[in-house]
UniProtKB/Swiss-Prot annotation:
SMART domains: Pribosyltran_N (SM01400). The lineage of its organism: Bacteria, Pseudomonadati, Chlorobiota, Chlorobiia, Chlorobiales. It comes from Chlorobaculum tepidum (strain ATCC 49652 / DSM 12025 / NBRC 103806 / TLS) (Chlorobium tepidum). GO terms for biological process: 5-phosphoribose 1-diphosphate biosynthetic process; purine nucleotide biosynthetic process; ribonucleoside monophosphate biosynthetic process. Its cofactor is Mg(2+). Belongs to the ribose-phosphate pyrophosphokinase family. Class I subfamily. This is Ribose-phosphate pyrophosphokinase. Mg(2+) 2 binds at D170. Mg(2+) 1 binds at H130. It catalyses: D-ribose 5-phosphate + ATP = 5-phospho-alpha-D-ribose 1-diphosphate + AMP + H(+). Its EC number is 2.7.6.1. Pathway: Metabolic intermediate biosynthesis; 5-phospho-alpha-D-ribose 1-diphosphate biosynthesis; 5-phospho-alpha-D-ribose 1-diphosphate from D-ribose 5-phosphate (route I): step 1/1. It is found in: Cytoplasm. SUPFAM superfamilies: PRTase-like. The active site is at K193.
């Protein structure tokens, strides 16, 4: 008997879950998560999931409730005899706390890995981890997708590739920016910033030439937008022409929207890994990653290679030809 597939939506990003289910041609599993009056979370599956291959879709931002809800959904699935449970985290929260960067602090990324595994996840599927080595915090299969294949495709269709350079807003993002530069056939520029204290970014010097060029700043996330907006300002002052940004995760906390609205950016391209308030910002454009996740889930379910999806040529063919 064939193992049935079940796609479950947590409350963090129901729209993305719907799109993924539509890509797979399967309805969302009949399930409900709700809060009791004291704030405790209750999860209920209203259909049999015994023996099913389950994919629970939940980004963990804001972290506390969404992570707890995901753990409870996994626990309920395990106790209902699901055959295999894959936790699908388009955005993996707490990934920035991946090591002890000062004395007497937690390694929360590892704690989250332990919690997911202990709750009963058999496999993890996520995208653009802030620190890729977090994969090693797990002793279960871990599939790590890259949004760059989707974002690069989008940039190629924007008619800005002429006279373009790709920039990293800090030294840590060079690897990601290099991938964009390589795929787009452009030079790479680095903005070397020093951060005096948490959530305060200070731009220093630009390594590379931006004078008279269009510039695409690339990052894995935009949180308060300080880093990327300051980098754009520095590039503009150094003679950059039109400035764009591409980032995977639109956390957009605190003053982010206001900063982007008043920034020198022409456009800021993000994915729908998170639901955010960017409707209030005309500069932000969203590209869906639903087909990328849909294809990855299909491949995991069918026992096929997921690394096939790391190549943008495969992605373009696969997910744009899919109806």
């Amino acid at each position: 008997m064939e193992t049935p597939i079940k796609i479950v939506a947590g409350r963090s990003n129901p729209e993305l879950a719907k799109k993924i289910a539509a890509y797979l041609g399967t309805p969302l599993c009949d399930a409900k998560a709700e809060n009791f009056s004291d704030g405790e979370i209750s999860v209920n599956y209203f259909e049999s999931i015994r023996g099913s291959d389950m994919f629970i879709i939940q980004s963990t931002n804001p972290p506390a409730d969404n992570l707890m809800e995901l753990l409870i959904m996994i626990d309920a699935a395990k106790r209902s005899s699901a055959y295999r449970i894959t936790a699908v985290l388009p955005y993996y929260g707490y990934a920035r706390q991946d090591r002890k960067d000062k004395p007497r602090v937690a390694i929360t990324a590892k704690l989250v890995a332990n919690l997911l595994t202990q709750a009963g996840a058999d496999r993890i599927l996520t995208m653009d981890l802030h620190a890729p080595q977090i994969q090693g915090f797990f002793d279960i299969p871990f599939d790590h997708l890259y949004s760059s294949v989707v974002l690069i495709d989008h940039v190629k269709n924007m008619d800005i590739a002429d006279n373009l350079v790709v920039a990293s807003p800090d030294v840590g993002g060079v690897k990601l920016a290099r991938k964009f530069a390589s795929e787009l056939g452009t030079e790479l520029v680095i903005v070397d910033k020093r951060r005096p204290k948490a959530n305060v970014a200070e731009v220093m010097n630009i390594i590379g030439d931006v004078k008279g060029k269009n510039v695409l700043l690339v990052d894995d996330m935009i949180d308060t937008a300080g880093t990327i907006v300051n980098a754009a300002k520095a590039i503009k002052e150094a003679g950059g022409l039109k400035i764009y940004a591409a980032a995977t995760h639109p956390i957009l906390s605190g003053p982010a929207i206001e900063r982007i609205n008043t920034s020198v950016f022409e456009k800021v391209i993000v994915t729908d890994s998170l639901v955010s308030e960017h409707d209030f910002c005309s500069k932000i454009e969203t590209v869906t990653i639903s087909n990328l996740f849909g294809e990855a889930i299909k491949r995991i379910y069918d026992g096929e290679s997921v690394s096939y999806l790391f190549d943008s040529k495969n992605i373009s063919q696969k997910i744009t030809n899919h109806h």
